[in-house]
Amino acid sequence: GYKYMLIVTSDEAKARKMCDDASFFNREAIYYPAKDAIFYSADVHGNQITGERLRCISRIINHSSTGEGVLTVVTTMDGIADRLIPVERFKEAVITLDYSSEIEPEKLAKKLVAMGFVRTGMVEDKGQFAIRGGIIDIFSYTDEAPVRIELWDTEVDSIRMFDVESQRSIERLQSYSIFPATEYIFTEDELKNGLYNIKEECDRQLECFDYGKRKRTKEQIEAGNNLNKLVADVERTGNYEKFTDT
């Protein structure tokens, strides 16, 4: 039989209620939210949406290999309209570690950055990781607490969930799967292509102002300045997805 059921509702409130109703009847259901055009890039609300979307994607991936019964995904019209990378690419990006794994911290750091994680001195929030000698802390959007991996040389010696505030261990794990901290995973060539497309689009838009034939208005000057900042903003945030061919 089938493993998934997709239900599309007219708005978020109905979608969330449907998930709650399904849980009441012991049916596995998860809500997949749409991006909020206004708040998606804001730290607090944007991270919440990102977390929900990534948790849903990870549940779908896990269910395909280990789940029994039917997983119901509930979303809205806006939710199914969002463009995503193929699920196979998302699966390929997942890193699974256990006590037989060997890790070179800086190579892992490069992979984590490509997966959307932000390197910090100390992990405080989801989407961050930190490396201090042979200690690697990772806080995935799909987890409720960060994970600390301790190395003996390059071998995994300990995998534990820990509390952010107290730094105390919560639970010892036998293995740990690191899911991407972004919905968009690109190769280096795709990123370069995306940046090139952004620059081309910026130049085309600036030409529309026809600077040589008429005096620019205040609004045109402001728009031009904003366009010139676009490339720098994209490089800073990694928001290439709209401009890539994937």
Where on the chain are the PLM-derived regions?
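ASCE RecA-like P-loop NTPase motor cores
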Residues: 1-246
